Every structure is written in structure tokens, then in C-alpha cells.
Amino acid sequence: MTYDEYKEKVKTLKKWAYAYYVEDNPVATDEEYDRLYHEVLDYEMKHPDKALEDSPTKRVGGIVRDEFTKAKHIKRMWSMEDVFSKEEVQDWLDRVEKNVGECDYFCEPKFDGASMNLLYDDGKLLRAITRGDGVVGEEVTDNVRTIRSVPLVIDYKGLIEIRGEVVIRKDDFEQINEERLKAGEAPFANPRNAAAGSLRQLDSSVTAKRRLVFYPWGIGENTLDQKKLSEKMEFIYGQGFLRPPYHEACHTIDNIEKFYQFLISKRDEIPMMMDGMVIKVDEIEKQEELGYTVKFPRWMCAYKFPAVEKVTQIRAITLQVGRTGVITPVAEIEPVNIEGAMVSRATLHNFDEIERKDIRIGDHVIIIRSGDVIPKITKVLIDRRTGDEIPVERPTHCPTCGSELLDEGALIKCQNLECPDRVINTIIHFAKKGCMDIDGLGSKIVEQLVKEGKIHDILDLYSLTYEDLADLEGFKEKKISNLLDAIAASKGAPLHRLITAMGIEHIGEVASRALALEFGLGIVDAKYEDIVAIDGIGEEMANSLLEFMRVNREKVLKLFNTIKPTVEKKVEAKENPFKGKIVVLTGTMSESRGKIKEMLEELGAKVSGSVSKKTDFVIYGEDAGSKLTKAESLGVPTLTEDEMRAML
């Protein structure tokens, strides 16, 4: 076989593979495909230096890993703001157009799958990373290479991040679950879980069998010069990526609503699960001008589809004990399929709601589920009662530890601080991101450690040894050392994160920061009048903090002594031209904008990402763009970086 013949056969094999795996429309028999596949493989084994990067043989799974490594996105992968009605869409449009004027909008289906970031370097697929926390995800490149709708090579120089959704078709999802049931394995709850679970297989040959599909929806790092997102996406589609079955350019709320209703009408026909429609400002310059909140881009939102209702029957009511001791009733229901998700539980919130709705065991009820929202019961079908239904009694003793419960009406609490369920949930909260961020200490491991008697409270984490973990099922040398290293690394964390991690009722991240700055380690002895004097801290929060410290003072002091948290210093900015001012930065400065932002915040300024009439100063560097133009049109004072420094 000559090299030209080899290239032609690779081209044919790619066409056949795409038709079979992506379009679900085979154009060759299995025998023909296998024969051609092995001809190509034989040539590549004899001439490995001539093997093409995008040959279908490169996709076959078989690589087995011990674990996944963490990898950082070049540009952050953001979440999206959700809207649920035409009125909420109009509010969102009003906010957008108030800042940047009339816009073109790019609308497309929102597929329900696992978000993925593909990094290409000079056209070759270099890395595939899960969304993770938006900054860091898990590298799953070997698994993603098995997805036929992911090109291994594209026509692009330099680095480009192509973001999209990995999904499973509805028919394939049902087939996978049938196979899992036959093998004695638990079925996946929904296609999203199936896609995510398939991507996290340590053996890539398992992923290869799952027939995953990748739909691109956005771009991170890139040097494309198109002025609109839709134009950039046309370039991406032209590289061999799948185009969504429908997408639309819209200009008004009526255009948007019409396309939204059209997608709803196609919901059952489209082979992938959709849970809404994504609306994006199309013009790149306006996207940059709108910027981002802490969580979302201001230039895009997800218009979620209506909740789906189903009728089912309550089999039993079980009780869950949270970290604060609150007892939450959960309805165990006859399993029902809602939009591809098998639902077997629904939240009941509290016992007052059970009494208000007169919910009984054996009742037929209507439940709804919308997106990621936990299914809930909306109505009891009283006309279907037979008389055999059993009223639900308010519990008097904890289902886990048996201690007497405190009934406060809507809330019923277990007051035993050593209740195993309270301990487990307290430690899970303590270890999660935004708190102590102990990597690898997930819910299953916490449950195992508590049930095996290795830990009884948070403090016990910091005295765990290799020997404590060596005899536990599933704990190998590397896993043990990684966990112990992660626990040790959490020492010295900022005090506000430790306060958040303690799980004090009503005290969230923002309040924890304010308390840490005001009191430092003296928070254990803080007085009521000093607490409520802090901006944003009310009576309920103050009382909650005081009660927590009264009960747990000695434990908190031991935590401080063990963890030695970093105490942030409260520095009152001296009088300066920027104290209390709203400032916007734009253009290239002599040092990173992050450092200049930090400097201005230390001076008491609030640094915003967008220009408005409320902006006091726009400070600009080289290649300043639309923010500077908008400031000038609004009459907002503008300063060069040198002028800003001169004012100081």
C-alpha cells in the first residue's frame, strides 16, 4: 500500500465512522468497516512515522489510568444565569440593552450533558478538560479521543479552547441502562449522569463503547478575528464539529419567544435531552463590554423549559438528618421517568408542609422536576384515595441516634452533636470547595471514615495517620498519601474560609469575611452589640453566631490552634481620591489589571467590570476599547495609568 492509498483509505474510514457513530446512519457493513480498519492499522504499524494524527485508529480506547489529573482552563468556564419566563427574559434583555444598546442575539438548544473544554495546539487535540469548578477540571483526553464527533486535528495555528457539551442520545441511554441492569449494575439516573460517568472511566475502552456525542457551544482562548460569536461558531462547525439541529439569529423578545416555543415543540423529536435554550449577545465587543458577575457572563442566559409533571405514588416517608440537626422528610415514590431521568424520591421540605398538603403514605401525587431542581410534590390526588393511606406522624426521636428531638414547628431538630449523620454532613460541608477545600475528601470517604470509627468530628481529620487508613477498603498507598497531603494543605487557610466551614446557621461566605476582618481569632468572644454593628449582619445572624460559640467555644479554640488560620488584617484606607469611588479598568497597563485592581481596592475603591452613569473614573491603558468610548459618551472622567498614579 502506498502512502497516498493509505491516506485515501483513512479518508474513507473516517467517513464511514462518522456516518455510523455520529449520524447513526451506517453506509458500510460491519465486515467492510472492520476489513478497511485493519488494512489501515497494518500500514500504521509498519510505518508509525507516517500515521495520520486524525486516523480513526487513534480513537480506540484501551488506556487504563490509576486516576485523573487536574488541569487548568486557560480561560474560565462560566456558569449561566437561568431565566424561567418571557417576563424574566425581557428583564434580562432590558439589563443588557440598558448597558450596550440594541443587540443581535444568537439562540440555540441547551443540551443536558457534561460540559467539556477541548484545547487544540497548532491544530492538534492537546487536552480535554471537564468543567470542574470553572477554573480547574479533570483531564480526560484519552476518553474524549474516543468520541467520533471530536476532530483530532483542525485547521488552526496557535492555541484555541473549544467548549461544548458531551451528550448521550436518548436511545443509547436506554440501551446502556438495559446493559447495566443485565450486568447487575445500577442504572444511570439520567443522560447527563451517564455522559459524565462515561467520561470518568479510568479505562478508555469503556468510554469508547458509550457512543458519546460532542456539540460545541462556545470558545475560550482564541485568536479568531470574527466580530460575532455566530461567525466564530461557523468557523468551528467548518472544522468538522457537529452543528446543533437548530439555531437562530434573534433581535427582539418576540423572535426569541417564537424560537423558544419552536424548540419546545421539537423536544421529543430531537434525539438528545434538551432542558432549555441559550440566549447569547452575538457581538463580541458588546460581550466584552457587558463583562461578568461573580458567577455568570452578563451576555448570556439559559431560558429553561417548563417543568415536567408526572403522577406517581408515595411508597414511604424517610427522614434525613442535616449537619445542623434539622430533620427533613423525603417521599420515597414509585419510580417514574421524567424527561429521561428516573425519579424515585421527592423533597417534602418539612412536616408543616406535609400537614398543610395532607400528604399520606400511599397517596397518588403530582410531582414536578425542572432541570437540576430536586423533584417536589405539587398536589395530592385526594379523589384517588382508597382509605388505606397512612397519615404521617411527626417524629419525636432522631432516626439515626435515637435522641429526643426538639420540635420548633416548621423545623424539627436533633440536638445531639455526636449524632453520626450530623457528624458526616458537618465534615462533608467542612471539606468542600469554598470552605477548607480538602481535595479527595468526598461524601463517600467521609461516611466510610465515620462509620469505621476513624473520625468522630472535624478535629479528628487532623490527627489521621497512614496506619489509620491502611486497613480501609479501597485505600491504596497513593490515595492515602494524597488525602493526608490535602488535609495538611488545608492548614493555614484564611480565617473567613474556616468560619464558613464551621457551618454556623445563617452565616455564609460574605458574612464570614466581614466577621473575620472585624474580630480575627477574637470571634469566639465577640459581643452582640459589636456583631450587629457590622454592615450586613442582622440580629438573626448575630444570635446564631453567639449560640454556636457558646456551645462550641472549646472546639473552635482547638481548631484555631490546630489549623492556625491566616488572619486577614482590617486596614482602613486613608483618605485618597479613589476611596469610595466606582472605578473601571480597560486596556493594557504596565502591570496586570489584577494587581492594579487589588491596589485600588486596598485604597477603598470598588472596581467594576462595566461602565455606567454611576462610574466615577475609567482608567485606561494601551489598546483601550469600547469601555473608554462609552465613558466618553457618558461624560465619565477618564484617566491614563500615569494620571492615576500621579493622583496618589
Curated annotation (Swiss-Prot):
Q: What class of enzyme is it?
A: ligase
Give one GO biological process term. Answer: DNA replication
Q: Which InterPro entries match?
A: BRCT_dom (IPR001357), BRCT_dom_sf (IPR036420), DisA/LigA_HHH (IPR041663), DNA_ligase (IPR001679), DNA_ligase_AS (IPR018239), DNAligase_adenylation (IPR013839), DNAligase_N (IPR013840), Hlx-hairpin-Hlx_DNA-bd_motif (IPR003583)
Q: Which SUPFAM superfamilies match?
A: BRCT domain, DNA ligase/mRNA capping enzyme, catalytic domain, Nucleic acid-binding proteins, RuvA domain 2-like
EC number(s) reported in the record: 6.5.1.2
Q: Which residues are recorded as binding NAD(+)?
A: D30, E31, E32, Y33, D34, S79, M80, E108, R131, E165, K280, K304
Q: Where is the active site?
A: K110
Q: Which residues form the BRCT domain?
A: 573-648
- Which reactions are catalysed by this chain? NAD(+) + (deoxyribonucleotide)n-3'-hydroxyl + 5'-phospho-(deoxyribonucleotide)m = (deoxyribonucleotide)n+m + AMP + beta-nicotinamide D-nucleotide
Question: Which GO molecular-function terms appear in the entry?
Answer: DNA binding; DNA ligase (NAD+) activity; metal ion binding
GO cellular component annotations of the record: cytosol
Binding-site residues for Zn(2+), renumbered to this chain: C398, C401, C414, C419
SMART domains attached to this UniProt entry:
BRCT, HhH1, LIGANc
Q: Which cofactor does it need?
A: Mg(2+); Mn(2+)
What are the disulfide bonds? Answer: none
Q: Which PANTHER family match?
A: CHROMOSOME TRANSMISSION FIDELITY FACTOR 18 (PTHR23389), DNA LIGASE (PTHR23389:SF9)
Family stated for the protein in its record: Belongs to the NAD-dependent DNA ligase family. LigA subfamily.
Q: Report the function annotation for this chain.
A: DNA ligase that catalyzes the formation of phosphodiester linkages between 5'-phosphoryl and 3'-hydroxyl groups in double-stranded DNA using NAD as a coenzyme and as the energy source for the reaction. It is essential for DNA replication and repair of damaged DNA.
NCBIfam families from the xrefs?
A: dnlj, PRK07956.1
Name recorded for this polypeptide: DNA ligase
